[in-house]
């Protein structure tokens, strides 16, 4: 196994661990029961496309220079993980009893200083040191978030 193969295996394992953590552990095992699950608008599709093109270039170079089949297979597996993470997986915001998960980071409700709704359909949540810009797929979800936060506060 070459250094390249080891690097590819490490990236695949990290991507798999993130996918399992994001899909199952955050939703069911961390911080109690999920009260509301809101799908968010996808961002970073161009980044995923650029990464896939770079992987295709690596695959082409590996095939044309008679590289190992294992390296080509690992590049394809990494490409599949990138496709899943960038295009299939739906980002979401999970509301629990004590706080919410946004971007896989838990934020307590007590940290919320202010909330605003912009004209573009963004929910702006001001925390102590930064603001979160949350864009949902359906505008009805903003009302669900609002009612849940009013109920909790």
UniProtKB/Swiss-Prot annotation:
Q: Which UniProt keywords apply?
A: Cell inner membrane, Cell membrane, Membrane, Transmembrane, Transmembrane helix
Residue stretches spanning the membrane:
6-26, 46-66, 68-88
- Supply the InterPro entries for this chain: DUF986 (IPR009328)
Protein localization = Cell inner membrane
Q: Signal sequence: where?
A: none
Q: Is Transmembrane helix among this UniProt entry's keywords?
A: yes
* One GO CC annotation: plasma membrane
The way it spans or sits in the membrane comes to:
Multi-pass membrane protein
Q: What broad class describes the main subcellular location of this protein?
A: membrane
Q: Which NCBIfam families match?
A: PRK02913.1
Family, per the entry? Answer: Belongs to the UPF0266 family.
Alphabetized HAMAP family for the sequence = UPF0266
Task: Write down what this protein is called.
Answer: UPF0266 membrane protein SG1324
């Amino acid at each position: 196994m070459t250094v390249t193969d080891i690097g590819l295996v490490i990236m695949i394992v990290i991507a798999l661990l993130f996918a399992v953590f994001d899909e199952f552990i955050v939703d069911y095992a961390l911080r109690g029961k999920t009260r509301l699950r809101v799908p968010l608008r996808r961002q970073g599709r161009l980044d995923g496309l650029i990464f896939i093109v770079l992987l295709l270039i690596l695959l082409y170079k590996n095939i044309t220079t008679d590289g190992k089949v294992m390296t080509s297979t690992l590049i394809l597996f990494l490409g599949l993980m990138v496709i899943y993470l960038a295009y299939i997986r739906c980002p979401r915001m999970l509301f629990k009893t004590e706080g919410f998960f946004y971007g896989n980071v838990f934020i307590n409700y007590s940290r919320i200083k202010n909330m605003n709704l912009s004209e573009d359909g963004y929910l702006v949540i001001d925390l102590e040191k930064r603001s979160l810009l949350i864009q949902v797929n359906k505008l009805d979800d903003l009302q669900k978030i609002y009612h849940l936060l009013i109920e909790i506060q």
